[in-house]
Amino acid sequence: MSDKIRLLEGKVSSVAMDKTVVVRAERYVKHPLYGKFVKKTTKYYVHDEKNECKEGDVIKFKETRPYSKTKKWCLVDIINREK
């Protein structure tokens, strides 16, 4: 396994579950044939122990041990709070 810690940033899209937030992370991928950069979004389930995130916050999260079947990411820091 790699020693490099995977850190990602994304925007919180749902806080409906207890100690879990749903985060959408955007990335740009080059189309293989046409060469145009296309925006792709990926949905991550992130563990939020203190339930401190709100919908619309921009957060930083890292890969960690599996908390459940789908939740393998943990909250590191809240970068920008939604007002």
From Swiss-Prot:
Q: Any S-S bridges, and between which cysteines?
A: none
What SUPFAM superfamilies does the record tag this protein with? Nucleic acid-binding proteins
Main function: One of the primary rRNA binding proteins, it binds specifically to the 5'-end of 16S ribosomal RNA.
Task: Note the superkingdom of the native organism.
Answer: Bacteria
| InterPro entries, sorted | NA-bd_OB-fold, Ribosomal_uS17, Ribosomal_uS17_bact/chlr
UniProt keyword annotations, A-Z: Ribonucleoprotein, Ribosomal protein, RNA-binding, rRNA-binding
Q: Which GO terms describe its biological process?
A: translation
Q: Describe its partners and assembly state.
A: Part of the 30S ribosomal subunit.
* MF GO annotations: rRNA binding; structural constituent of ribosome
Q: What is the protein's species of origin?
A: Francisella philomiragia subsp. philomiragia (strain ATCC 25017 / CCUG 19701 / FSC 153 / O#319-036)
Name the CDD domains for this protein. Ribosomal_uS17
Protein name per the record = Small ribosomal subunit protein uS17
Q: Which family does it belong to?
A: Belongs to the universal ribosomal protein uS17 family.
